[in-house]
Amino acid sequence: MDRFITVAAIVVPIFAAIALGILARRKLWVTAENVQGFQSFVMKIGLPCAIFNSCLTAQIGAESVSSMALAFPTVLLGALWAFRFGRRKFPYHNLPQLFCAQESGMLGIPLYMLLFGADQAYRMGILDLTQSVVAIPVIAILSSDTGENPTPSQVVKKVMTSPLMIMSLLGLTLNLSGAKNWMQGMGVLGIVTETTGFLSQPISALMLFSVGYNFSLAKGSRKHIFQIAALHFGAFAVFALMIQGALFLIPGVDALTRWAIFLYCMLPGSYLAPSLGRSEEDFTMASGVCSILTVVSLAIFCVMASVVA
């Protein structure tokens, strides 16, 4: 009974936030603009603060380098497959974005924080930084020559100057350079971490509410949506097994790193994919795939929580 209560304490708030998002859309409690405001707060303030805090205070060891080295070829292979073979069967312009990046920013980091605490968020943040090496060129390619859309250089500049990227790199720089120790000696570190920690508190609830609000599954293209979702899940499940096997060969890798890799592979494809489409069909496909994979990843997270709790 105690184990059930422990798991329920993690899982019930997740589905409560999602259910409230669905209900809010049906009852018109909030508008799409309101939800975009929630997401903007998360991506520009809350999440960068959480990642900065985690990267600043983390004891980053060899396991972080191992995670980066193993995650990079995973998303690279996904992107190459989507460009070379995937679009032959599924002729959607934005298909590669679903396979070159997992939604570790909006969903992965908040879920990982729920389970292991904000101080461990850097483990997922490291993976988010790693995939950006592949995702940024893909975004540039998909967004090029689209009329009113930004040029590739503008998109790359926007990603590289995003609050999440800046705060991640700033936290890592202060940590690895030794500036963190100076801040601690001056008594500043505690003030900084308490402030950023306070600002990051609402991010999990806001993002899960947004997931429920934006859930959609169009009827016209359900066959392709389910096929692509199944393909994505199967591919990253195989990647997860391969990476876990490789981690057993590396000494000193702890359980939290393994869980971060596992959760990362079980996440949906990037929520940015719908916005990179060139047609209504592209948008519908990407939105549907993201919706299905979000439900699947949350179900897996519940199982994961029952094991870890």
Could you say what each language-model-derived stretch is?
Residues 1-309:
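Alpha-helical transmembrane segments of multi-pass small-molecule/ion transporters
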